[in-house]
UniProtKB/Swiss-Prot annotation:
Subcellular locations according to the entry: Cytoplasm
Keyword Disulfide bond on entry: yes
Organism this protein belongs to: Buchnera aphidicola subsp. Schizaphis graminum (strain Sg)
Designated name of the protein: Dihydrolipoyl dehydrogenase
Principal cellular location given in the protein's record: cytoplasm
Gene this chain is encoded by: lpdA
Record-level Gene Ontology MF annotations: dihydrolipoyl dehydrogenase (NADH) activity; flavin adenine dinucleotide binding
């Protein structure tokens, strides 16, 4: 059956970008249609990404923490892993959140249409599902179709033992020997999960620099922390994957300027990045422009080259982060409603939800150097934090970068427990143009990990009393 729908705004995709845009449009009084080809709202993030990965990382951390408590005089037996129960628990979390989204959409009177969207014209889309097809006419459209995992064409991808991130998060099995190709955030998080569950994990990454966006003094702490849990092989790549007579996956691994190694694995995860989901939309038909990397070109109001069609989230390029997407969604909806708003954040924080966590925001040292900024680094090691000692998490550090001419904070990074929860203070300080004195004179509760931020500012100020004050002779 064919139906025609008229709407002020149509949004394609219901991940964090799409549902946020739809709900904001509805709140602003705009008649809104939200198109989603999956059965549930929430996109990759809620269903097969951010949320399920954090639930499994939570389990992994508890397993690790419990094993370390023996040093404090508390002993636990070796954990029993019940995959079925873990998956049921994970599914309950996802279902609760997706149901909540559907309820919020219904209460806002957002019309939800299930199916894949294809642009007919620059003012209409065709949507088909198993039962119906729709032509939806719109004044404005927002493309929020997200991204998909990149495959390695040379691998036997038809083999169901070669996984992408969605497969890994479905927790089909716990491989004894697990190879992860790609040492980025996704690969590291999966290594954290599966090593805690009992897998012997190797990570290979073809690049020489580990997490190149993060300063080396931070990543060195992380590399030190993982040595007993899994192996990280940099400057290394997979040459081939074959099946043995015993049906193992035989992998040839080559390090640059070194001999090949042949290893056997039960499963392989390919985590080399993601690409935008734009192939099925028919964008070429309406003349909507993509850049050289295949992402949709936008301006600061999230408009494409077709001024009434907007794009937000992963389809617009790096950083491909849900929190960036949500902010873009709000701006796009507000621009459509007539507000003169722009997407122009000073900084966007990034987090690797590993153990320990790594979080960073603003400029790194290398970026400050490349921008010819006269900067100074201020460090507070968590080995000097009372809360870190009490919580058994002294392997950590808070690092701030200040402009020496203005004393303003321009960047920061944290490695350690709950770094993801701490980094926002640094982001806010940069957005507000705060200087070191603003941060150091803001009284932080004690004992906390968050006070490491004010203490790092005190190091820069030369007022620190929790460490030896190396600047005192300069300030007298």
């Amino acid at each position: 059956m064919h139906q025609e729908i008229q709407s002020e705004v149509v949004i394609i995709g219901s991940g964090p970008a799409g549902y946020s845009a739809a709900f904001r449009c509805a709140d602003l009084g705009l008649e809104t249609v939200l198109i989603e080809h999956q059965e549930r709202l929430g996109g990759v993030c809620l269903n097969v990404g951010c949320i399920p990965s954090k639930s499994l990382l939570h389990i992994a951390k508890i397993i690790k923490d419990a094993s370390e408590l023996s040093e404090s005089g508390v002993f636990f037996n070796k954990p029993i892993i019940d995959i079925k129960k873990i998956n049921n628990w994970k599914e309950k979390i996802i279902k609760k959140l997706t149901t909540g989204l559907s309820n919020m959409g219904e209460k806002r009177k957002v019309r939800i249409v299930q199916g894949k969207a294809l642009f007919n014209t620059d003012h209409s889309v065709l949507v088909k599902n198993k039962k119906n097809d729709f032509t939806i006419f719109f004044k404005h459209a927002i493309i929020a179709t997200g991204s998909k995992p990149i495959k390695i064409p040379s691998l036997p991808n038809e083999d169901n033992r070669i996984w992408n991130s969605t497969d890994a998060l479905s927790l089909k099995s716990i491989p004894n020997r697990f190879l992860i190709i790609g040492g980025g955030i996704i690969g590291l998080e999966m290594a954290t999960i599966y090593s805690a569950l009992g897998s012997k994990v190797d990570i290979v990454d073809r690049f020489n620099a580990f997490l190149p966006s993060v300063d080396k003094d931070i990543t060195d702490i992380y590399i030190k922390s993982i040595k007993k849990r899994f192996k990280l092989l940099l400057n290394t790549h997979v040459k081939s994957v074959e099946k043995s007579k015993d049906n193992d996956l035989i992998v040839k691994i080559a390090e640059e300027n070194s001999d090949e190694n042949v290893c056997c694995y039960d499963n392989i995860l390919v985590a080399i990045g993601r690409s935008p989901n734009v192939d099925f939309l028919g964008l070429e038909k309406i003349g909507l422009k993509l850049n050289e990397s295949g992402f949709i070109e936008i301006n600061q109001q999230l408009k494409t080259n077709i001024s009434h069609i907007y794009a937000i989230g992963d389809v617009t390029g790096f950083p491909m982060l849900a929190h960036k997407a949500v902010q873009q969604a709000h701006i796009a909806a507000e621009v459509i409603s007539g507000k003169k708003h722009y997407f122009e954040p000073k900084v966007i924080p990034s987090v690797a939800y590993t153990d320990p966590e790594i979080a960073w925001v603003g400029l790194s040292e290398k970026e400050a150097e490349n921008n010819d900024i006269d900067y100074e680094v201020s460090l507070f090691p968590w080995s000097a934090s009372g809360r870190a000692h009490a919580s058994n998490c002294t392997l950590g550090m808070t690092k701030l970068i200040f402009n020496k001419n203005t004393n303003k904070i321009i960047g920061g990074s944290i490695i350690g427990t709950n770094a993801s929860e701490l980094i926002s203070e640094i982001g806010l300080a940069i957005e507000m143009g705060s200087d070191a004195e603003d941060i150091s004179l803001t009284i932080h509760p004690h004992p906390t990990l968050s006070e490491s931020i004010s203490l790092a500012s005190e190091v820069f100020q030369g007022t620190i009393t929790d460490l030896l004050n190396l600047k005192k002779s300069l300030l007298n």
